From Swiss-Prot:
Residues 641-672 have a biased composition (Low complexity). Involved in production of the polyketide antibiotic thailandamide. Probably has an acyl transferase activity and could also have a flavin mononucleotide-dependent oxidoreductase activity. Its EC number is 2.3.1.39. Residues 673-689 have a biased composition (Pro residues). Residues 627-689 are annotated as: Disordered. Pathway: Antibiotic biosynthesis. Pfam families: Acyl_transf_1 (PF00698), FabD_helical_ins (PF21607), NMO (PF03060). This is Polyketide biosynthesis protein ThaF.
Length: 1154
């Protein structure tokens, strides 16, 4: 278990730093990172001569990396002693330590992130702190002062909770607690982590989440941020660790459910034993609780006790302990593959190991020494001979190294073929079995025909994958990731030849076709892979005795994975960059290339430029071998590794079927049907979506759960007042998306299903909006409620006039910073007084807000100056004005978190509670008769997200991005085909075309397009140059040829035809404004191309979209809904609501122990 801020003190871990080399080694590593980034030494602050116990230690720039370093170093020390955790638990900053131990992200990367996070908090956040309160959380919930001036950060057990906030506010809270006689104490921190105090740093965190790597945990990770086991962490999740509330009790219960509590030992590796104390209060017996560090304990003796404790327990199968060196540094052996062979290799080794050579000759049927020394008929260049030769030379070199120097490596790894040598060195199989496997592998690969390979130099993996996705090269896979910008591709020979033009135009500085006849490590090797799988089946392959890094994953093999990994390696990429970075992250500082040549040493310098390289020729017993292969620039591409298809490649491994319920009576009651194969061309429009009632009928009103509480039903989700006010059955809204993407069909489908849809009016003419209103009204003869989008801007007044003429009574107000006269006029036009004297407001406004000051404007009555003017002008009566003063502008407020399109990058868990409180406070102060419902939008694409929103108090949810990829969406089918493929990381931020000069951002699709990169480039050019004439010739040519497809003069002529006359007049007198108009033209062009589905301009598509759609795609993967042609907006809403209700019921039962 790893704790967070508040548990630190000067001198934590001093005894371990002085007595344990492994502990000292890791602390020193992070001391170097901290000194490089801040100029401050962790070691000096913790253990230096001027470091005094008891002095304040709350400088986040130091405490962030110090807490991480000490806890991580202690965990690695235990691992070096053979103690491997079965599960890791993190709380607050401790979650980062747990993530690093579980290999979710590299430790040094996390430390750098924490240091940057601390710096950003210092810039953006007011001073704050946290209070630990001894007493039940009901104290907080029952105190107006506590709820107003602080946030509940976490409830650790029945009599202990933590609150946080701004310093000035918490002083009031302390006074209130003192008056009530409640015991509390301040934690030694400078900020109120997990509270409103750190909300200002959220945009910074989200904007820089790409700086964090994120992989699936190799050790089960229980997170207090998640309140359970984290199975598929994202970079966004890691950024939330300092922001979201802590849920220690839920995380602890999740751990207990992973195994028998009677055999579970809870080891607190934090500085103060904080989490062990919490676990004890939750009922964990003392003999199952262990603390290593403490300000007054004997850390070294406690470390010994924990090490002995774990030594008596069985190690989980397949988890070999890394033999971490207790000396100055760890080292790893690297074994090269094809590409390193030279005539004369192994000459000094063959006579030294005659028995091994006799075995090799018997297995191969020829004289291996003669092959290597004489190279008859250039056979060393033929893979069926190269592979056995390299394996034997590598193996003998390893044996010689061990005889000459008994030190065992901490890790071993091999490149492609070299992985077999690494596995032999680790004892996974015998010398002769390894040779038999390699012989067969070489024979199968030599039989491959019609394939080719090429090295792409100068581009990284993402760029190579992007070019492959955008090209017509459908058969090419990435085969080797040798260095960050040295990548080998493989595929059909004709495509490999054609690919040269694509990559050279894409910016590579060299494209080298390799002299091979097969597309090794690509999908073209699938037949060979299947044959090899049959061949390897009877071999005796055991668990490696030394950790071996697998080519396919870049992570260590577990005991039962080796056979499968060698089979997959035939047709999967060699992730050599990941391999080396992983080894470096584990503390490896010395690399020895075992075998012949210096290919891997050369690559090492490119992957880890801060390290001089491997120990090179000194690591090999062969004199002169290093000079046998001359280093080149760029270095010679190495062995052909396995390749998975890039993003655009079709075949993907199947995952577990979704557990979503069917949404129609005819659907199967079990798992959804498998997804159909992607259609080669757009299919005819499917039949209308099925009725929703059967989907919701699974949870009848009488359903209960073991007599504890009724199961959550869909109708119960959200606020009854919201549903009553807007005439809905369900608390679900489909928001308006511009250019009619939120279409007539979409609005009608939602209305007929008892939900609300808003037509997307942005970018449309008044005539088009009028036609849409009439079409919707005609399709809803029963008068089902619908809504129209209303945007702040130059068409606002005319649009309100249109709505009043056409009888529109419900609008979604978007992009407003304040209440305008037009919006007030729409509201007032619906006010009347009934026969009982009560005010009736027939016109409903749902206001989308992302900032507290905007929420305040909509929660307030219509500004008095507007009312006075409207009365004076006869627009409204005195009675209407009096009624307006007693009600807010908005009938509902929707808090907009980080969404597709325009976004302030807000975080739902921070924004929603804050604005809910704000709205409640304003309503109370003004004495409003009715509640103003507060809902949420942004990031809702799965039942889990919907459930989280309702748990946070949302009165309704609003979705956007996921509806864009449906049958009813008004976007082109080409875009829908692209959108159904995206994942959560496939969006990016780009300048907003309508607010280009201000630098406002929109969130857009990144995968498969150049728009975000080009749009950001245009904004940088706009900042750099003052006129079109200032643009360098090379830049002008690039814009005209690559971006616009026409001359800048032609673009400006288009602007003169499109933009209002007053804007053109300003541009004629202001060269900077003219430049802006020309650049803004690109944004309109990119949007029009996407709407029309113009494939010739596909790379320029602007598609506003958020990561919620990526999450939805993952949820429905391998179900019928994977194909957008089966996605109906109302059916999707039904499934999300039903599964959210089911999830909430299950979570409740787990909380009460049922």
């Amino acid at each position: 278990m790893f704790s967070g801020q508040g548990s630190q003190y000067v001198g934590m871990g001093r005894a371990l730093y002085e007595s344990e080399p492994t502990f000292r080694h890791h602390v020193d590593r992070f001391d170097e990172v901290t000194r490089d980034k801040t100029g401050t030494s962790l070691v000096a602050r913790l253990y230096g001569r001027d470091a005094r116990a008891g002095e304040p230690f709350d400088d986040t720039h130091v405490t962030h990396p110090a807490l991480f370093a000490v806890q991580y170093a202690l965990a690695r020390t235990l691992q070096a002693r053979g103690a491997q955790p079965d599960i890791v638990l993190g709380s607050s900053l401790g979650d980062f330590v747990a993530a690093a131990l579980a290999q979710v992200a590299p430790a040094q990367e996390i430390v750098a992130w924490l240091i940057d996070q601390a710096a950003s908090m210092a810039r953006a956040c007011e001073p704050g702190f946290m209070l630990a309160v001894l007493g039940p959380a009901s104290i907080y919930r029952g105190s107006d002062t506590l709820r107003e001036f602080s946030d509940l950060v976490g409830v650790n057990y029945a009599e202990h909770f933590v609150i946080g906030g701004n310093r000035a506010d918490l002083v009031r809270v302390e006074a209130a607690l003192a008056r009530e006689g409640v015991v509390f104490h301040r934690l030694p921190v400078r900020f109120g982590f997990h509270s409103r105090n750190v909300a200002p740093v959220v945009p910074w965190l989200h904007a820089r989440e790409a700086n964090l790597s994120c992989r699936a945990p190799t050790i089960p990770w229980a997170s207090c941020t998640a309140g359970g086991i984290v199975e598929a962490p994202t970079a966004r999740f890691l950024t939330r660790i300092a922001i979201d509330p802590l849920r220690f009790q839920e995380a602890a219960r999740a751990i207990e459910q992973t195994g028998s509590p009677d055999t579970l030992h809870w080891v607190d590796l934090g500085p103060s034993g904080t989490l062990a104390n919490f676990a004890r209060r939750l009922g964990v017996p003392n003999d199952r609780l262990h603390v290593v560090m403490g300000p007054f304990g004997d850390d070294a003796r406690a470390l010994g006790r924990v090490s002995n404790l774990h030594a008596s327990n069985a190690r989980p199968a397949g988890a070999p302990a890394a033999p971490v060196s207790e000396g100055v540094s760890m080292h790893a052996f690297l074994f090269p593959g094809q590409g390193s062979q030279v005539k004369g290799m192994g000459a000094a080794l063959f006579a030294r190991f005659p028995d091994r050579m006799r075995l090799a000759n018997e297995i191969l049927g020829y004289d291996l020494a003669a092959l290597c020394i004489e190279n008859p008929d250039n056979r060393l260049g033929q893979t069926q001979f190269t592979q056995p030769a390299m394996y034997v030379v590598n193996a003998l070199a390893y044996l010689a190294r061990r005889e000459d120097d008994a030190g065992a490596p901490a890790f071993v790894a091999g490149h492609s073929l070299g992985e077999y040598s690494a596995l032999f060195a680790a004892g996974a199989f015998s010398f002769e079995d390894g040779l038999r496997l390699v012989k067969k592998r070489g024979e199968l690969m030599s039989a491959a025909r019609d394939g080719g390979m090429a090295a792409v130099l100068g581009l990284d993996e993402a760029r190579v994958a992007e070019i492959l996705a955008l090209s017509d090269l459908r058969g090419i896979d990435i085969a080797n990731l040798n260095a960050p910008t040295q990548i080998v591709i493989a595929g059909p020979a004709d495509e490999i030849r054609r690919a040269q033009q694509w990559f050279e135009q894409g910016g590579c500085y060299a494209y080298v076709v390799l002299p091979v006849s097969g597309a090794f490590h690509s999908r073209m090797m699938r037949d060979a892979q299947r044959e090899f799988e049959r061949f390897i089946a009877p071999f005796d392959i055991g668990a490696p005795g030394i950790p071996v890094i697998a080519n396919v994953t870049g992570r260590p093999y577990r005991g039962d994975e080796v056979r499968r990994g060698l089979v997959e390696q035939i047709a999967s990429p060699v992730r050599w960059v990941d391999t080396i970075r992983y080894l470096s992250e584990q503390g490896v500082e010395r690399f020895a290339e075992i075998g012949t040549g210096t290919v891997l040493t050369d690559l090492l310098r490119k992957i880890l430029p801060q390290k001089a390289g491997a120990s090179g020729a000194a690591a090999r017993p062969q004199a002169g071998a290093a000079s046998a292969v001359a280093a080149s620039a760029p270095p010679r591409p190495t062995g052909m590794a396995d390749a998975q298809p890039p993003a655009a490649s079709p075949a993907r491994a199947a995952t577990a079927a979704s557990t979503m319920p069917p949404a129609s009576a005819s659907a199967s009651a079990s798992a959804p049907a498998p997804a159909p194969a992607p259609a080669p061309a757009p299919a005819p429009a499917p039949a209308p979506a099925p009725a929703l009632a059967p989907a919701f009928a699974r949870a009848p009103a009488s359903t209960s759960t073991n007599g504890i509480a009724p199961a959550a039903r869909v109708e119960q989700l959200g606020c009854p007042e919201f549903k009553r006010r807007f005439g809905l059955k369900y608390a679900y809204v489909a928001g308006g998306m511009v250019h009619g993407i939120a279409s007539v069909r979409m609005v009608v489908a939602m209305a007929k299903a008892g939900m609300k849809g808003y037509f997307g009016t942005g970018g449309l003419s008044l005539d088009a909006i009028r036609d849409a209103v009439r079409a919707i009204r005609g399709a809803l003869p029963a008068g089902e409620p619908y809504g129209m989008n209303l945007l702040s801007g130059r068409l606002e007044e005319a649009t309100v006039d249109l709505y009043l003429r056409e009888g529109v009574t419900s609008v979604e107000a978007a992009a407003y910073m304040h209440v305008t006269p037009a919006l007030a006029r729409f509201k007032l036009a619906g006010l009347s007084v009934d026969r009982d004297g009560a005010t009736v407001s027939a016109h409903k406004i749902l206001a989308k807000v992302s900032r507290p000051e905007v929420a305040t404007a909509f929660m307030s009555p219509i500004p008095e100056k507007f009312l006075e003017r409207f009365v004076r002008d006869g627009v409204i009566s005195d009675a209407q004005a009096r009624a307006a003063r007693a009600m807010p502008v908005a009938d509902a407020v929707c808090v907009e978190a980080d969404s597709g399109g325009h976004t302030d990058m807000g975080a739902m868990p921070a924004l929603l509670p804050a604005i809910r409180r704000l709205c409640a406070d304003i309503a109370g102060e003004r004495g409003y008769r009715d509640k103003v419902p507060v809902g949420v939008a942004g990031g809702i694409g799965t039942p889990e997200a919907a459930a989280a929103a309702f748990v946070l108090g949302a009165d309704f949810i609003l979705t956007g991005s996921i509806n864009q990829c449906t049958v009813e969406s008004g976007i082109s089918d080409v875009v829908k085909d692209m959108l159904q493929q995206i994942n959560v990381h496939d969006t990016d931020y780009a300048p907003a075309g309508d607010m280009f000069e201000l630098g406002a951002k929109v969130q857009v699709l990144r995968r498969g397009v150049f728009f975000p990169a080009r749009a950001n480039r245009l904004y940088e050019l706009y900042k750099q140059y003052d006129s079109v004439d200032d643009l360098p010739d090379a830049v002008r040519r690039q814009l005209e040829d690559k971006y616009f497809g026409k001359s800048l003069a032609e673009v400006y002529a288009d602007c003169e035809r499109y933009y209002p006359a007053d804007e053109i007049e300003r541009a004629r007198g202001n060269p900077k404004q003219k430049l802006a108009l020309i650049f803004r033209w690109y944004f309109g062009f990119a949007t029009r191309a996407a709407l029309a589905g113009n494939e010739a301009d596909k790379v320029n598509f602007q598609v506003q979209c958020g990561p919620a759609l990526g999450a939805f795609n993952q949820w429905v993967r391998n179900t019928a809904l994977e194909n957008w042609r089966n996605r109906h907006v109302a059916e999707m809403a039904a499934r999300i609501l039903q599964d959210a209700a089911d999830l909430l019921s299950r979570r409740y039962l787990s909380m009460v122990g049922r």
